[in-house]
Every structure is written in structure tokens, then in C-alpha cells.
């Protein structure tokens, strides 16, 4: 029997909120400095305008989460309009993730000033190390990211509270220049919206009702970002200019000399890349600032890791949907798509080496995220079948037009950013076209391989069991669930056990994938999994020989233990049988112990039998 591999909905708002902050809130670490650099003592007006936009975008994404409870990211929502539009939006989001990884890594090493190498080289090395770790598909990285996010909120709040007595002394100047220049400066800090797509991608695993969970996750994070950004902007404006140019590192002095920064602009350029660190030092103390800088750097590095895995996920999902070659969907033994991982590491790595400047990376950053958000909003408001109220559709349409205006402004004023995003989109669309052409040629020439004997047998199993979905235990027959990838000893042991109890055996084959799924779960396709086909045929033959009724369940999941428990509960089994793992200490360290995870969450009425 072939069943849908739905992911368990276990993500509560108090889990999703810190995860969202880890993506969305990270931008504070470079947006504040960029705002002060571009707008100087007029920064407050631009931050107020950005706060209004953040509130609007946050509200819009709470609506998107309601509309798409199984995944509302740009790739998922745009597919309702056009698959080509979905691919275009996904590639823009991919460009965003490339620069997220490069910029976050670079800024991390501006906050912690390490010796011997430049921040760009340290950033490249950190991306490479994270890439190596991701070969093993670590599942515990999320917990570390949550800790870093919570600590960042605490440290940022301490800085904000310490600065409150000085806010009355903030030097706020009127806007100078023309409205055109104001608009240009505003688009320079638009990357503050980056990370909002994360919440839409989480809806597929959110606790129902998804609308309520998403709303509770979004609004506390949004309020924290808006309020603290405004307080910290006032805190920047309250500091004397001399405080920004004290005790500068040799590297910053050298950089400003190379850039020929005018003397009057040095206070605004000096800490563009580590503004929160200098605020911590000025308002709290040097020791606190050093500790805070490490925490901020860890959050930035966790953002690098998230961007890399999300970039892998985009490529994997497109390959799964036959938009990229099949090799992009190939998993290593750790459940990680290897080819997408290599690309997701090398592209940001070379980006940060070729563009070793936070300001220039910020230019590249903005065009990707703004484009992805514009496509997502535009897809929603133009899909007339969606249950949107008139005022909701109107407000989201205004936001979509605004995002498009910002996108075209960036494309016009920063042609290098357009060229960067265009190159990524062009490579992606070309690869997609070649993939489609190859499939067409295969069909025409008759080279598409027909699924033979093994899959025929699986087809018989499917016909006997019916279509996907849990089979109700109407006969109250005893059921065992066996989690296996085809171990003959474990299969035979389970059949012997079942024969003694006159039980039916459900054999569960879990194909592990170690990347987040940025969209609704698709029906697992066993036709693309030769190992599962072989296991299904072997189990069918052994079951017939033993005279025991068997069913074969196949799914793809990112958490093996949770999936086993979910199937055990869904199918009402009385016993779960698992073999001892041959995987070593490294697997358990990176991913956790499967048996321990099952034992902790299995209902008391269900026995767990471990076969050595």
C-alpha cells in the first residue's frame, strides 16, 4: 500500500515565533547601520516608513498563511497562477537566499573581529564549514538557532532599555533633498522585510487552526522588530558623532581610507556593519558589547545555515516537480540532496569573496527578496477563487504594486543587482528548459523506461489495499507496525511475531530527507525509489510465504521518529517493531536517536519492541 506522507502538525506559535525571528529579526543587525549610513540623522523618518511597510507586509503574510495552510511560500502560492511564475518566484527567492548567506556570514565577522584573515575570508570559510556539516543533514541546528534568536532578543532589549534615558537627546534632522532621493534612500533599507517568507513556508507543519497559529507567531515578532528598531534608531541619533569614531579597528580605518570617505561622513560609515555592537558598548558597557557581539554573530551564522538549507530545499522541490534534472533530487545516505547542497554552498561562498562589502551585498540582497514578495502578493490578489474580502484584496493589491515599484527602482538604480538576480534566474530557467526538452525527447523516442516486474508487484499491493490513506481497523485485527528499509532478519522476525498473534503487519519504509519542505507535501513516488521497490517486493514474497497479511507503507519525511509515531497512531497499531540502528555516534549526534524519539512519544497503549 502506498500512502501520502503528510508531515505531523506539531509547530506551535511559540516555536514558530522564535524561528521567524531567526530569519526576519536578523536583518536588524545590518539594517540599522545601513539606515544610519544612508540617511544619517534623518534615519528616524525612514525607519518609521519602513515600520509601516513591515506592519503591512506582516499583516499580508498572516492572510497568506490563512489562504495556504499547507504552505504559502512564493513557490506554492504562485503555482495556482502558473508553474512558470512559481519557478520565476522561486528563483528570485533563491537569489535572496544566496545573498542572505553571503551577507549574514560577512556581517558576523564584522561583529566578531577575528585576526589573521579578512572578514570576507572568514565568512567564506564559515559557509564551507556549514556546508560540510550539512552533508550529514543535522536536525539539531534548529534548536541552536532558537537559542541564538532568544538571546538576541534579550541582548537587544537590554540595549534598548539602557538607551531609553538618552532618547530625549536624539538629534533628528528634517529630510533633505527631493522626494525622489527620499524614495531612493528608502529602497536602500528595504531588506528589512527579508525573512518574512519563512512564516509562510512553515504553515504545512503548524498546529491547526493554522490561521490562529500563524497570527500568534507573526504579530509578537513584528511588534518586537518595529518597536525595538525605532528605539535603537533614536539611540543611534542620540550618540555624539565622536563616539562612532573612537577606538576604530585598523581594518575600518584602512577601508575608509580606500573609499576616500570624507571626514564629516566617517561617523556614519565607521559602524555601518556592526551598529548594534557600538550601541551596546556606548549604552551598556564594553564587556557586555563583546558578549553581545558573539551572540549576534551566532544568530547571523544560524541565518547562513537556514539560507543554505532553504536554498537546497528550493532546488529539491523543483527537481521533485520535474523542473530541474533528477540528480537534484538525489539524496545521500544522510537524507541530504547532495548536488543542491554543493551549489548552495559554492554560490554564496564565491559571492562573498567577489563582493566583500556589506553595502554592495545589501544592493544584491534587496532585489531578490522584494521580487519574491511581490510575486507572492500578486499571485494571491489575482487568484480570484481565493476567499479574500474586498478590503483585504484591495490592501494586498496596494502592497503588491508598492513592492513592484520598489523592485523596478532597485533594478533601475542598481543595474549590478539586476544583473545578479537576472543571472540566477537565467541559469535556473535555462536548466528548466533543458530538463523539459530532455523529457520531451525521451517520450518521443520511446526511451522512457517502463516500470517492470517489481513495480507491477507494488501495483498489485496498491490495488489490493486501495488508494492512499489510512486503512481503518474495522475487523479489530491485531496490527503491528514495522519500521524498516528491508532488513530480511527484521522482516522475518516481525512475520513470526505476527503469526503467533494472528496479526496484520504494516511495513513502513521512511525515506529520510534532511531539508525543510517549502510547500505542501506531495504524494511520495515510490517509482523514483529503487530501494523501496526492492523492499516492497521482498516483503510481499516473504509475507505470502509466511501466510501473514502484510501492507507496505512508503513515505518521505524529515523526522523519522515523529513519522513512525504518527503512522502508529493513525493506523491504531498495538505494537511497533524497530531494529537496532547500525548508524554510529555521528548520526545520533547530528540527528538524534530514532529509537529514543519513538519511545518518548509513542502512546502508552502501544508497545515498542526492539529487535537486536
Give short role names for the model-derived ranges.
Residues 1-31, 76-78, 84-87, 181-186:
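Membrane-interface "cap" regions at the ends of multi-pass membrane proteins
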Residues 32-90, 99, 103-127, 222-225:
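Extracellular loop-to-transmembrane helix junctions
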Residues 73, 217-303, 327-352:
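TM-loop-TM module centered on a large, flexible mid-protein loop between adjacent transmembrane helices
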Residues 84-86, 120-125, 207-228, 316-353, ...:
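Loop-to-transmembrane helix boundary motifs in multi-pass membrane proteins
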Residues 127-163, 176-177, 218-220, 364-375, ...:
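Membrane-interface loop-to-helix entry segments
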Residues 144, 327-338, 373-415, 446-451:
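C-terminal membrane-solvent junction of multi-pass transporters and transport-like membrane proteins
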Residues 146-201, 207, 223, 235-261, ...:
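Helix-loop-helix junctions that connect adjacent transmembrane segments
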Residues 471-529, 542-544, 551-553:
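Small/aliphatic-rich secondary-structure junction motif
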Amino acid at each position: 500500500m502506498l500512502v501520502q506522507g503528510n508531515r505531523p502538525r506539531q509547530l506551535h506559535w511559540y516555536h514558530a515565533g522564535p524561528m521567524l525571528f531567526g530569519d526576519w529579526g536578523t536583518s536588524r543587525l545590518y539594517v540599522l547601520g545601513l539606515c544610519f549610513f544612508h540617511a544619517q540623522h534623518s534615519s528616524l523618518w525612514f525607519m518609521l516608513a519602513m515600520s509601516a511597510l513591515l506592519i503591512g507586509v506582516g499583516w499580508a503574510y498572516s492572510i497568506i498563511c490563512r489562504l495556504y495552510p499547507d504552505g504559502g511560500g512564493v513557490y506554492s502560492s504562485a503555482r495556482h497562477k502558473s508553474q512558470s511564475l512559481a519557478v520565476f518566484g522561486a528563483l528570485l527567492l533563491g537569489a535572496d537566499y544566496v545573498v542572505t548567506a553571503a551577507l549574514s556570514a560577512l556581517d558576523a565577522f564584522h561583529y566578531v573581529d577575528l585576526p589573521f584573515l579578512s572578514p570576507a575570508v572568514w565568512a567564506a570559510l564559515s559557509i564551507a564549514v556549514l556546508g560540510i556539516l550539512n552533508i550529514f543533514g543535522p536536525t539539531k541546528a534548529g534548536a541552536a538557532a532558537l537559542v541564538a534568536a532568544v538571546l538576541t532578543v534579550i541582548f537587544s532589549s537590554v540595549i534598548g532599555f539602557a538607551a531609553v534615558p538618552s532618547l530625549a537627546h536624539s538629534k533628528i534632522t528634517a529630510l533633505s533633498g527631493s522626494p525622489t532621493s527620499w524614495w531612493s534612500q528608502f529602497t536602500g533599507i528595504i531588506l528589512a522585510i527579508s525573512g518574512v517568507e519563512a512564516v509562510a513556508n512553515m504553515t504545512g507543519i503548524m498546529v491547526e487552526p493554522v490561521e490562529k497559529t500563524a497570527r500568534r507567531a507573526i504579530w509578537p515578532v513584528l511588534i518586537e522588530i518595529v518597536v525595538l528598531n525605532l528605539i535603537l534608531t533614536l539611540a543611534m541619533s542620540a550618540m555624539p558623532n565622536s563616539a562612532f569614531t573612537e577606538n576604530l579597528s585598523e581594518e575600518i580605518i584602512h577601508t575608509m581610507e580606500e573609499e576616500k570617505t570624507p571626514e564629516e561622513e566617517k561617523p556614519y560609515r565607521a559602524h555601518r556593519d556592526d551598529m548594534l555592537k557600538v550601541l551596546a558598548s556606548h549604552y551598556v558597557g564594553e564587556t557586555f558589547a563583546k558578549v553581545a557581539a558573539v551572540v549576534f554573530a551566532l544568530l547571523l551564522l544560524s541565518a547562513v545555515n537556514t539560507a543554505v538549507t532553504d536554498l537546497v530545499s528550493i532546488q529539491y522541490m523543483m527537481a521533485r516537480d520535474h523542473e530541474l534534472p533528477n540528480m537534484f533530487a538525489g539524496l545521500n545516505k544522510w537524507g541530504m540532496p547532495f548536488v543542491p547542497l554543493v551549489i548552495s554552498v559554492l554560490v554564496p561562498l564565491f559571492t562573498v569573496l567577489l563582493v566583500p562589502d556589506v553595502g554592495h551585498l545589501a544592493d544584491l540582497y534587496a532585489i531578490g527578496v522584494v521580487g519574491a514578495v511581490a510575486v507572492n502578493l500578486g499571485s494571491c490578489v489575482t487568484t480570484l477563487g481565493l476567499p479574500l474580502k474586498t478590503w483585504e484584496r484591495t490592501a494586498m493589491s496596494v502592497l503588491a504594486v508598492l513592492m513592484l515599484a520598489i523592485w523596478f527602482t532597485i533594478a533601475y538604480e542598481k543595474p549590478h543587482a539586476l544583473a545578479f538576480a537576472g543571472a540566477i534566474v537565467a541559469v535556473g530557467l535555462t536548466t528548466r528548459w533543458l530538463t523539459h526538452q530532455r523529457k520531451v525527447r525521451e517520450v518521443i523516442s520511446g526511451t522512457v523506461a517502463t516500470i517492470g516486474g517489481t513495480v507491477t508487484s507494488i501495483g498489485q499491493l496498491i490495488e489490493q489495499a486501495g488508494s492512499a490513506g489510512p486503512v481503518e481497523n474495522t475487523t479489530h485485527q491485531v496490527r503491528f507496525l514495522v519500521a524498516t528499509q528491508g532488513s530480511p532478519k527484521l522482516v522475518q522476525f516481525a512475520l513470526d511475531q505476527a503469526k503467533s498473534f494472528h496479526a496484520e503487519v504494516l511495513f513502513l519504509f521512511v525515506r529520510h530527507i534532511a531539508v525543510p519542505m517549502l510547500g505542501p507535501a506531495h504524494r511520495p513516488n515510490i517509482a523514483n525509489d529503487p530501494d523501496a521497490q526492492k523492499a516492497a517486493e521482498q516483503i510481499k514474497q516473504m509475507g505470502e510465504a509466511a501466510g501473514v497479511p502484510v501492507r507496505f507503507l512508503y513515505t518521505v519525511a524529515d523526522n523519522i521518529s515523529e513519522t513512525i509515531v504518527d503512522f502508529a497512531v493513525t493506523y491504531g497499531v498495538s505494537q511497533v517493531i524497530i531494529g537496532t540502528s547500525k548508524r554510529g555516534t555521528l548520526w545520533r549526534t547530528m540527528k538524534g536517536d530514532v529509537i529514543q524519539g519513538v519511545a518518548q512519544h509513542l502512546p502508552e497503549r502501544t508497545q515498542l519492541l526492539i529487535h537486536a
